[in-house]
């Protein structure tokens, strides 16, 4: 019928699209790399905004980008398998400015040995931070090499390693600038005598976590005269004597964290000698009572952060909180878990602690509508509030619609008497308020048990500033298996409850097992 063969229509040009001929890849003669106008520092600053995967891809664009990326990377996270030894020379030639290094290995795999550790320390002489996790084939010889070659080391963290006290002593004797030491689940800890020399003169922070013989490091804790932060978490043995000696010889502590320990009021009274104390965490210490807390409150009047998990032993209550309300007028952060305060103590804190900005009430059967209404009326500076597992109803939450003028965030979880309608009404009244509401069923008691990875900090409320950091990972570290076999679980239970053996607890120490308001103690404002 006179029809011509069909042909592909020419594409309609996009008149709104502006092309720059100089950047078009087909115009080779006119091609200009505009990144050449950027200095290396500027290019490196751009790389800092990229994710780890994107930064890896960018390093393959050209030789200059590869060089800039290698010279400006200060953090490396490596999978510490034995095969890493073959790649260490070339890897650390490329990344010759590394100051922060993490070596991680799965607990079921063999790790790098002393030869690899010494070689790494020779190539990274400017290291300021070193983290070893699961490196079970490194002995005290490898750690001695770290001490000999990394004289600028300031922060050392070791978890699930086998070199024990000898390996730590080898580093401490050689790195006189070490300021921060963290030891978690360290094997081979028996006795140590010379740890207090050398690094004790510069150590400012010590963290001992889940050590079977953690008291082997008591001389180090006592001998560190510049110590500012002390964290002892889940370590076996009686710690009263160590704290008494710390209070006598090292009263400059600013932060003290005591968690899942065999410590009594004797230890708290010793801590009270640190008059400049700023932060105190007393978490699941079954034998601490109002007596020790009152002593700390009366002497440490600069306290700003207090976390108390009474483990529902009913030994910390109104008396201790009234002492805090009376003496700690600068209090900014208060977390109460598993204790039984009444209206009088909470009202005193709300009235006297005018700078209180963060408050968490978790698993407290004595906190109801009246207490929340009092907080809403008197806590003028309050910015963040967490209520979890408390008998509070819509009436109590409704008071937040007009109270606490500076309140920006509220978290409500596992409060059976609070309904979605009550929460929506508060949201309508205060549109700018971030309201996090969870009406899920109440969990079993202590649902946040440590699995050896998350650790004891899962049971506390942490208020941490948001920090944007690009963590560099050249070789992706395998995720450590979170599940453990029956033997590991039995060992963990023994380490947790073994300190209760032979101790005279009050009759109500285990009343929490029969309470109907069981609630997990984990909470967060995140």
Language model features: what each stretch is:
Residues 2-20, 25-28, 192-209, 215-223, ...:
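C-terminal capping region of solenoid repeat domains
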Residues 1-147, 152-205, 217-222, 229, ...:
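N-terminal adaptor-interaction module of cullin-RING ubiquitin ligase components
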